[in-house]
A protein has these predicted regions:
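N-terminal nicking endonuclease/strand-transfer module with a His-rich metal-binding environment
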Residues: 1-250
Length: 250
């Protein structure tokens, strides 16, 4: 299903690469089931309000639509298992992967190599890759601070249409492979509770930027963790408020 190795170097991925980030950031890959709005968000068919201007274009490579892949998986599952796939099954998953900079050519090449490695080692099949260079925040001086990242969409099933069974060890190995292929420092092992989705990461960058300007130095590892913990706590608190409000409205 994955047929992107032959992408011409002069095609859509051949973009000018300005405003490179020189600060080394740690790798992070966060994998979750796709949602109903994943494809529209990733392709920018529905543009979020928080996008910021970028001199480097996004990359969108789609081998197949999510809906079509799911239909193929469901058909294969019925043929091999003899019954319909459960509605709560998550055969298609999506990774949000932090990128070190906005070098589209290099990042795309590394992402494709990572996809090949994941397919060979675990049977994970990527069928969409989206590189986003237009998210981040504008600081107090009007300068753009970008959150470069990619969304990769996977067929997370075996040749019988059954979901792949990967445990903590395999998921940790995927974190390591991501760091190696993207040529980034690996995120700390066991720090899953401090990982942020890309929306939370945007807020983290904004807070981090302001504090470093106030302190006139880079934040320590301890200070960095404290920011992440606070963001996660606030996110959980907001979710709880939403749940309580919905109960009251009933």
């Amino acid at each position: 299903m994955w047929a992107l190795r032959g992408l011409p170097r002069g095609g859509r991925a051949d973009c000018s690469c300005k405003n490179k980030i020189l600060i080394m950031i740690k790798s992070c890959i966060k994998i979750k089931p796709v949602t109903g709005g994943s494809e529209n968000h990733n392709t920018r068919e529905v543009k979020p309000k928080y996008l910021i201007p970028s001199e480097v274009e996004n990359i969108h490579i789609v081998d197949a639509k999510i809906e079509d892949v799911r239909k193929e998986i469901e058909k294969k599952y019925i043929e091999n298992v003899g019954q319909k796939m459960q509605a709560k099954a998550t055969p298609i998953r999506e990774a949000v992967i932090l990128l070190p900079d906005n070098d589209n050519d290099k990042n795309l090449e590394n992402l494709l190599a990572l996809n090949d490695a994941l397919k060979e080692k675990y049977g994970i099949q990527a069928f969409q890759v989206h590189i986003h260079n237009d998210e981040g925040h504008i600081d107090d001086e009007g300068k753009a601070k970008y959150n470069y990242h990619a969304h990769v969409v996977y067929n997370w099933t075996d040749d019988k249409g059954k979901s792949l069974k990967l445990g903590k060890e395999e998921m940790s190995e995927i974190q390591t492979l991501t760091a190696e292929y993207l040529e980034m420092e690996r995120g700390e092992k066991g720090s899953k509770s401090l990982s942020l989705n890309h929306h939370e990461y945007r807020g983290y960058l904004e807070i981090k930027d302001k504090l470093e300007k106030e302190l006139k130095q880079e934040l320590s590892e301890k200070q960095d963790k404290e920011i992440r913990i606070k963001i996660i706590e606030n996110e959980r608190e907001n979710k709880n408020i939403g749940r309580n409000t919905s109960r009251i409205s009933r």
